[in-house]
From Swiss-Prot:
GO terms for cellular component: plasma membrane. The gene is slc52a3. Glycans are attached at residue 157. Keywords: Cell membrane, Glycoprotein, Membrane, Transmembrane, Transmembrane helix, Transport. This is Solute carrier family 52, riboflavin transporter, member 3. It is found in: Cell membrane. The chain crosses the membrane at residues 3-23, 40-60, 73-93, 158-178, 239-259, 277-297, 301-321, 334-354, 369-389.
Amino acid sequence: MAILIYALACAFGLGSWLAINGLWVELPIIVTTLPEGWELPSYLTVIIQLANLGPLLVTLMHKLCPGRLKESVVIYTILCIGVLACFLLAFFLGRDNCGGWGPAQRSLLHHYFLPGTSGLHLLSHLPALHDAAACPLHHHTEGGDTYVLQTQYLPPNFTTEVFFFFLAVMMCISLAAFWKLNRLPRTFEVSTENLVPDSVSSVCSGLDNPAVRTNSQKHLCEVTSQARPLLTKSGHSMFQLTFIYLMVVWVNGTTNGLLPSVQTYSCMPYGNLAYHLSAALASVANPVACIVAMFFPKRSLVFLGLLCVMGTGFASYNMAMAAMSPCPLLQKSALGEAIIVLSWVFFTGSLSYVKVMVGVILRDESHSALVWCGAAAQIGSLIGSVIMFPLINMYNLFQSGDTCSTKCPL
């Protein structure tokens, strides 16, 4: 039963960011055809942040109308919208832009936090099956001796229509997994809910009938009294929690807002192959980091802080190359392409590990700490995307260029 639940939790979790991650990995092909061009990622980051209105509305419903909102119905609705969005993208990508949604992970059981997180990004690397588009130069003659230089991209092995149909099927699998999870017997809730000690303590207090207390109840009271300090004791000081939350804001702001907005400017000058590999391999680094966190958890705040600094260093290099677009360092060289690809992979992998481990730490702290972790993550993502949007689309601090015909000084 445990293996089945783990598998279903992973299958359900992959639907959370599958459509969005798939859209990001497909950007090397999409940006060459849509009118937004290199600015498209900055639009997507802002559009994705609008999805935060959903959790906000759910929170307001819980506060204003407690007990009336069924989260399972909400998640069913969101998953169905995700399936529909993928189908619409397959048919209307050239005419309409839309962002995907992902189901809230609150319904995942406390005990299956890590497998759900791993499944959340499990299949985000599948778009790497696309072959990178080449960049041949096409010459044709007009009026005798006049040559016109045009950039043409070779089509990938799979069209965007096939790709988004595949994403729709994956979303259907996530929907089926959630349906199955809702119908499994929940015999494991007693061991995962924090409400159990409170209910046991009411039995121990003997409020209903103080004169009647069996030996088993007395033994249960003794066990509960010994376990209670372990459940209520906080393992981190206020300074440490502040550091953790600031790290959550920074890591999510960087990975979900600042850097994704400029990935095209950072990678495209090195060619479509470098952009394709950066997007695909960075998506692979995400689930790999989650799996590493499952088997090699490291809760040391010093280690996580150093890892965060290292990831920030890679992020700084990526941002610097984007600022130098369309003529970054080591352009048109194999070394430059390799460095930018590895920089994006290590940036994503290191900070993904930090995000997972910080979530595990705050999960063990308390349920409210984990809720505030989610709030801090969304705040950081929102700040990052809001900062980058005007810099790219209004102030034009990042310049696009033609990957084949742009001439840069030596």
